Design a protein with these regions (language model features):
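Acidic (Asp/Glu)-rich catalytic clusters
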Residues: 2-3, 41, 62-71, 93-100, ...
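Acidic-and-aromatic substrate-binding clefts and catalytic sites of carbohydrate-active enzymes
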Residues: 50-59, 79-85, 110-117, 141-142, ...
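Short, acidic/polar
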Residues: 23-39, 83-100, 115-120, 141-148, ...
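Conserved, mostly hydrophobic/aromatic
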Residues: 8, 39, 47, 62, ...
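A short, structured active-site edge motif that brings together acidic residues
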Residues: 68-81, 106-110, 162-165
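N-terminal binding-site loop/beta-alpha segment at the start of enzyme catalytic domains
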Residues: 1-71, 127
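Conserved residues at the C-terminal ends of beta-strands
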Residues: 9, 50, 107-110, 137, ...
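Beta/alpha (TIM)-barrel catalytic core signal, keyed to glycine-rich beta->alpha loops juxtaposed to Asp/Glu
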Residues: 112-227
Length: 227
């Protein structure tokens, strides 16, 4: 169910204003749906999203498309370091309403804040059948180990880690996180693998052009290797 090598990201799915500001261009809802259907028809069924993607419209689009073959990966994002009991459940219930579904295939702790409290809530929701698998995103090795320890106590597997990784961003390979995932049979999901198109020869636009401009220096060693 959750074993897939290519994940369809939906960070740019949303209103035209969001896409234009973030990436300098936008596509219609109809085009997004056609793209999703094409991906599913070719075996790419896992779609990764979050409540804050597309100014909140990304998840609503997924629910509106109502594609039964689509597998959904979404996230709980704690915007405050202070934990509030029930915050994970409240967020998931909103997500499920957006998706018009009774469960999500994978639920990630988007930021490693109040790890134990948030994962314990996820464990309850997992047992209730509202979550198919649990992961943690944007974490370091020690935080990943803590997450595994917490879930091991609950006899629930840590499904995966989702971090930034590409040819020019290999921090998690260098510091041992990727190897740890392999040794513990934990999936490692990489986001921004093409660096917003930089690794395909495209130039990012919109806000992304500012974010990725500082990374162009990292491309120089790659250019030398490629000749």
């Amino acid at each position: 169910m959750t074993d897939t090598t290519i994940i369809i990201g939906t960070n740019s799915w949303g209103g035209s204003l969001y896409s234009k500001i973030l990436r300098g261009s936008s596509v219609s809802k109809e085009t997004i749906k056609q793209t999703a259907e094409l991906a599913i028809n070719n075996g790419f069924i896992m779609f990764d999203t979050a409540r804050n993607y597309g100014f909140g419209k990304s998840q609503k689009l997924i629910g509106e498309f109502a594609l039964p073959e689509m597998k959904i990966s979404t996230k709980f994002t704690p915007f405050s370091k202070k934990y509030k009991p029930g915050q994970v459940r409240k967020s998931l219930e909103k997500d499920l309403k957006d998706f018009n579904r009774k469960f999500v295939d994978i639920y990630w702790l988007h930021l490693p804040m109040s790890i134990e409290e948030n994962l314990m809530e996820m464990a309850i929701l997992y047992r209730e059948g509202k979550i198919g698998a649990i992961g943690i995103s944007n974490c370091n090795l020690e935080e990943a180990k803590l997450a595994k320890e917490i879930l091991d106590r609950e006899q629930i597997p840590l499904y995966g880690i989702q971090n930034h990784y590409s040819l020019i961003e290999r921090t998690w390979e260098q510091n041992g996180l990727v190897e740890w995932c392999v040794n513990n049979n934990i999936k490692f999901w990489a986001w921004a693998v093409l660096e917003e198109g930089m690794l395909t020869g495209s130039t990012p636009s919109g806000v992304m052009s500012l974010i990725y401009r500082r990374r162009t220096k990292k491309l120089q060693p790659l250019y030398k290797v490629m000749g």
